[in-house]
Amino acid sequence: MRTILRGVTFGGSLLLLASVPASAQRSSVATGGSPAGWLAGCWALEGNGRIVEESWMPARGGVMLGMSRTTKGDRVTEHEFVLLRAVGSILEYRVRTGDQPEVVFRATAPSASEAVFENPTHDFPKRVGYRLVSADSLEAWIDGGAEGKGPKIGYGYHRVDCAKR
C-alpha cells in the first residue's frame, strides 16, 4: 500500500503547541481550545494543472478535523480526511486517503513554528511535517523517514477565502 499524503491535510494544527506543556496540550485540545487557530480555515496551492485545497475546522470536542481534495480540470483526483487529537500526552494525526485504511502518525517534537508526525512502520510516507512561514503561508512535506529512504515531497500553501473556493 503506497499512500501518499499531501498538503495541509497536513494537520499543522499542532504547530503552536511547542511551548505548551503536554498536560496543557491535552486539556486545550480536550476542551475544544484551538492551540493553532491560525490553521482553521482554507489553504490552497495551484500548479501543474491541478489545485490542492485544504479546509480545517477549529478544535471542538477534543479534535480538529481537516479535509483535502486535489482537482485537475473538473475531476477530483485525490481526497483525504484528517482527525487531529491528543491521546494522553501524545498528539495523533489520523489520516484516511481515498479508499485506503486509516494511518496514524504521532507528533515527535512540535515547536513554535514546526511539527513533525511520524509512523516508522508505514510504507510511505513515514513522516509528515509542517512549517509555518507566515500567518498566510504554510510549507508542508512528506518523506521516507529520518533514514532518508524515499523522496521528500514539499508543498507550499497560501491561505484562501473558504467562500470563494
Residue spans of the language-model regions?
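Short hydrophobic/aromatic beta-strand element in the GNAT-like acyltransferase core
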Residues: E53, R127, G154
